[in-house]
């Protein structure tokens, strides 16, 4: 039965590290729709009709057909009665990241340090100075930072990042200056945090939600006058992009060094696919200028 096939397919892909929460919901809904139509196999006509009925935009329509196509290919390997729906491919688009300058980061930290105190805890300004500083200096995902527990802070300035994207864990070493700032923050935190062991808490001493972090981050951006004249405002996730871009800007442009540095950075960031790291090459004019210069030298025969 198609619903059972969905469970098998999702179970297999999750065993490989994919979470697929939305995909599981979409495919389960599609399978129920197909069964209600009397289908025992994936049919192109049914897939197209379902995707058209539930999609509000061309992009979501394409995404649902892609999900069904991958599912159908999985089933087709076992039973050729299944049909793989056609889906138009459009070039993948990702919003250009906002790369914060050192001056902007300094203004943001200053703005965070001057946030208005909120009862019952005076921790608000300390929390956001540390959170922004940690994200900017380590490239952690915001979800990884908010999920940090006290026992994830290992000796020698290492963070243990547990079961994050693709269900992987990794160790993230920190710069000594970051370790020092984190220890000072924790000393202040102990006086007001209560019993919860999350590193970052909301003012009521409960684990901080992503929504709360983002809301306060936008307050900080406004106070620091960062990105206010843009149609699309900078995101907290852009701190991760900024970290990766600055690291790559400091890399030597020799081919062997670039390959080594990319692998190291991909591991540090927790990327399951190094292609996600290569994307950072497009992030700043400095990187593109370095790449162009290296390419010209290679063409001219100056690089072996």
Regions found by a protein language model. Give the residues of each.
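Conserved catalytic core of the tyrosine transesterase superfamily
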Residues: 1-304
């Amino acid at each position: 039965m198609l619903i059972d096939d969905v469970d098998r397919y999702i179970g297999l892909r999750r065993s490989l590290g994919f979470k697929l929460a939305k995909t599981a919901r979409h495919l389960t809904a599609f399978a129920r729709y197909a069964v209600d139509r009397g289908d025992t196999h994936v049919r192109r006509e049914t897939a197209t009709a379902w995707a058209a009925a539930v999609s509000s935009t061309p992009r979501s329509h394409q995404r649902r057909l892609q999900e069904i196509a991958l599912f159908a290919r999985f089933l087709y390997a076992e039973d050729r009665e299944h049909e793989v729906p056609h889906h138009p491919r459009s070039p993948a688009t990702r919003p250009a990241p906002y790369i914060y300058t050192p001056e902007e980061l300094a203004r943001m930290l200053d703005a965070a340090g001057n946030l208005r105190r909120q009862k019952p805890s005076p921790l608000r300004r300390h929390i956001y100075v540390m959170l922004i500083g940690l994200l900017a200096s380590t490239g952690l995902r915001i979800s990884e930072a908010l999920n940090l527990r006290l026992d994830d802070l290992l000796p020698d300035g290492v963070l243990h990042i547990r079961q994050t994207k693709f269900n992987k864990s990794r160790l993230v070493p920190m710069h000594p200056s970051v370790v020092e700032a984190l220890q000072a923050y924790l000393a202040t935190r102990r006086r007001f945090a209560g019993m919860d062991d999350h590193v970052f808490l909301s003012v009521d001493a409960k684990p901080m939600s992503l929504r709360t972090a983002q809301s306060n981050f936008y307050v900080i951006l406004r106070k620091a006058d960062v990105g206010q004249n843009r149609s699309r405002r900078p995101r907290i996730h852009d701190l991760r992009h900024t970290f990766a871009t600055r690291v790559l800007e400091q890399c030597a442009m020799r081919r062997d060094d670039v390959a080594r540095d990319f692998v190291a950075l991909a591991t540090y960031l927790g990327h399951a696919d190094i292609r996600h790291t290569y994307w950072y090459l497009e992030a700043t004019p400095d990187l593109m200028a370095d790449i162009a210069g290296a390419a010209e030298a290679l063409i001219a025969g100056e690089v072996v």
